């Protein structure tokens, strides 16, 4: 096999503190290219072409690189997607196969966090041609890109990278041949095929209607303003005159839990708050309920309502006026005497610290009087007020019939969501949409430990974190074709089906074959109403509860009817419960879990805890389901890409989000696209058997919908 090792150097643009090195930015340029044929132990000769550099007059021809790419059997890079997209944008044709040494390093990490740069990977594999260049790193930090660096430094650096990449590949081959790594050889080919699919959708991009996005922004902002006004009214009623910042963790602890820290240091020590040398969060200590209550009382104190009175020292102005002094001599002695001439600037009042008021305690307990449930709720500012914690606190407030707390917590949860929507999605899409009107997402194969795709980085936004249905921002994603249709095909209940598949749960399989709506069943229990009265929104909300038992959730701390759901789930789906026990026992023995697709996860220091579970239990039970689900979705993407090329369609594959594939569909190709997506996604079982030697027993079902944009969708029959 003729393997061409390649590395491209490009310019980058820094926009609002973000690095944009996308080939879709018309201001970015490919500075130079370096490539060579892989020999027995390295790349013996590295060729180069310079196309855009301040010290280089002219532009080298591309003929030799074009010919080498056409004659190569495989192109080898580190972070191949980046180089591949630049080559495609420049009009080159890729070889039949691509290979990414970063993907292999990611797979060899087996779910553990480790640096994946070429430099770190080469050090790890003891590559001889690695050239560490502090000069290059320093110039990057100073905002100097490759077109402005000394050309001889760039050439030396890039040529060494080409050789290091080739040698890294050669070092990886024998590691993959080791017995305990054999299964990874099944994953590697389809991850590289998936890489080409990602190149396709990223280069295609999605058409954005910025006017619609602006309307959504105004709607979000108007709702946010109303929420903030009402939340501040509630705060004033439960806290008195004390000023509260809704974005402050310490202030939210005061409002929600009615407590504040006595000593931050003592609080951190008591609840083991912080990180270890590896940067991982420390594990909270085990405490009985009474011990936890005592610890809360020792490290925090009750907050009282306050009344504001005018500061007597500054008359409520928050500052005092000082006057200049002059020196006088009287009877031979010097005296400093205040004059009537004031200083230009007033001085902050020390008594009220510039506020203009002094807050006096009324002796009445303030806040919503919620209770933290365990040491896991402790945080550096007092107690947690994150999204998941607030969900639990809402249930607690409902049990206590604390209507004010329910309203506040529900509204603060929505306010936080709106802030995320405005900052991450609306602003992110506005920033990332090119002058062409297209947003080009960036998908990452080597970030999520599970094997799931992530998105983001550079000018891209995290599409994986958006709400799945009914999210108004989706309305701005439209078709590039006149009268075109945005089609989305989504796997139905994939994670539940995957859990039933991996556990071979007989009841789960029977429910799937009978078409039982698991999420509706869950919603019926959670909402405490008959299944036929469950609304679509209630069913969607209940999905989170359905998935929790799949990943080892116990329902502890939940209301009795929800806790009963967890117990009932494990009683009904005994196969899943037994599989969970098997996973934990197996991980205790050898530290590794493997999926049918060959993906592996490694936990080296797992141990059994006092309550009978094992450490890392959530990951041990979650990763196999997430990983195999991800691999099934990626196989579907590969199949869709293959079928699209065969059909030579004008329609464009645009996104894969969660368990779905999105297509910007030409008006003349709707039926073809629906047919291709159905074949690609429901036929994944055949592909899995061919690639992995594994036969699926659980059928996969999809829902296909279409409409003028990503929000307004009608399900096809």
What is each model feature region?
Residues 1-18, 25-27, 32-35, 44, ...:
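Conserved "right-hand" nucleotidyltransferase catalytic core of DNA-directed polymerases
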Residues 678-690:
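A common structural junction motif
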Residues 196-199, 203, 306-349, 357-358, ...:
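Conserved catalytic core of nucleic-acid polymerases
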Residues 81-92, 105-109, 253-261, 492-507, ...:
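Short active-site loop/helix that positions an aromatic residue
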Residues 25-28, 35, 39-178, 275, ...:
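Active-site-proximal helix-loop-helix substrate-binding element of RNase H-like nuclease domains
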Residues 77-78, 98-102, 479-494, 557-561:
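Conserved catalytic palm subdomain of right-hand nucleotidyl-transferase polymerases, strongest
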Residues 107-111, 200-224, 499, 556-562, ...:
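Catalytic palm subdomain of template-directed nucleic-acid polymerases
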Residues 442-530:
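Function-dense linear segments that define catalytic or interfacial modules
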